[in-house]
Every structure is written in C-alpha cells, then in structure tokens.
Design a protein with these regions (language model features):
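Bacterial lipoprotein signal-peptidase II cleavage site
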Residues: 4-24
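Short helix-initiation/N-cap motifs at beta->coil->alpha
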Residues: 73, 89-100, 141, 158, ...
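A ligand-binding cleft/hinge motif common to bilobed small-molecule-binding domains
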Residues: 95-99, 112-121, 165-168, 193-209
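Short Pro/Gly-enriched coil loops immediately N-terminal to beta-strands
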Residues: 122-134
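Alpha-to-beta junction loops
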Residues: 84-86, 102-110, 153, 188-201
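Ligand-binding cleft/hinge of the Venus flytrap
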Residues: 60-64, 76-85, 161-179, 206-209
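Extracytoplasmic small-molecule ligand-binding "clamshell" domains
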Residues: 41-112
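Flexible hinge/capping segments at coil-to-helix
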Residues: 137-154
C-alpha cells in the first residue's frame, strides 16, 4: 500500500509542443484568422504524427487495444479533426520527445512542463493544465515532510519535473527511469525511498498498489 502528499512546487503541465500563435493586437485579428484559414486549406486531408509517452495515466496510457489512449490523445485527435487531418500517435520514451520533433514526429503531447530550456528548442501551445508534484512513499514510511527526503534515494521518470525536483534535494540521489511505473515498482520492492510524480498519475498508481 502506498500513500502520497503534494509538494509546494507547481508547474504548468501537459502543454502540447506544437507551435501556436496569437494575434498581439485587436487590429491583427482579421489577418490572423485569414492566415489560419489558409493554413487549414493547405493541411486538410494530411496526417499529423504526434509523439507521447503512454506511461502517464490518465493523460496517456496504453489502452485495451494496445494503442495510446487518454486525455491528451483524445485532445490531439480532436485538434486533428478540427483541422481535417488524420492524427497518428506514436508511443516513445519521454526523454526523446523534444529531440524528435521536426524529424520523426510533428509534435508531442505528453504531460510536458513548459521550461525555458525546452522553449529554446520547440514552440509550446498555451498551457491547459496546472499540475502539482506528489511524493509517493510506502504507507509505513518515516518520510512525512519535504525535509525528510534529504539523503534519500528518489525514483523519478527521466526528463520530468519530478527528476528536476529530486536533483535539487540536498543529499538525495535521483534514480531515473524511462517509465514512471518502473519507479513505482521499485518503490514497492524497497529499491527507492520515494517517488516524485504529478498528482494525477500518483493517484492512479496508488489505486493499483
């Protein structure tokens, strides 16, 4: 049995890494709308390939049919429908999503925090979800506050906000994983002392262990 608590750090999460533009003045609205219509005419009937990491329920996970599913997948497919385009979603490692945009994939939608470093590489849409980081520990753990994480081994998914936070904790060792579920499995098996992850996936994992 696991338990979790929220951290004081919050980040704008789940921002799809496909560029979006907003008219800066009211006078530009008509021009912007015309440009959008023209772009839609050029893309209609095409295919958009988006990458995700289907290890982040309820936002993205592998469905019963073996294909990526979840809130983000439904969202990007709705965008594709609005544009008159087919959307294909590829499941890949989270840490490779940003570097794959522009070659292997057209964009990414994967519960991704907007950071200055990432903004130097890709464009982000407006943020549509604000997430709080949770710390998951065994029910009998002595860890009850943020200070208790000092000098502990903390599991986290590679390239995520949880990893960035774990790396900043005094004396702590950030044990990274390609899949969040692997971090939770190691927590259950006593290989790490805690896991830092977004609130919603933490709540899902808590129901499974």
């Amino acid at each position: 049995m696991l338990t979790g608590c929220g951290s004081d750090s919050a980040a704008n999460e789940s921002s799809q890494a496909s560029g979006s533009s907003v008219a800066e003045t009211a006078a530009a609205t008509t021009t912007e709308a015309a440009a959008t219509t023209e772009a839609a005419d050029k893309t209609e009937g095409g295919v958009l390939v988006f990458g995700t990491n289907a290890e982040f329920p309820p936002f993205e996970y592998v469905g019963d049919d073996g294909e990526p599913d979840g809130f983000d997948v439904a969202l990007i497919k709705a965008v594709g429908e609005k544009l008159g385009m087919e959307v294909q979603v590829e499941n890949m490692e989270f840490d490779s999503l940003v570097s794959s945009i522009g070659n292997r994939i057209d964009g990414a939608i994967a519960g991704m925090t907007v950071t200055d470093e990432r903004k130097e590489q890709v464009d982000f849409s407006d943020a549509y979800y604000e997430a709080v980081q949770f710390v998951i520990v065994p029910a009998d753990s002595e860890i009850a506050a943020a200070d208790d994480l000092k000098n502990k081994t903390i599991g986290c998914q590679l390239g995520t906000t949880g990893m960035f936070l774990a790396e900043d904790i005094e004396g702590a060792t950030a044990q990274t994983y390609n899949r969040a579920i692997d971090a939770v499995n190691d927590l259950v098996n006593g290989r790490v002392d805690a896991v830092i992850i977004d609130k919603n996936p933490a709540e899902v994992f808590n129901t499974k262990f």
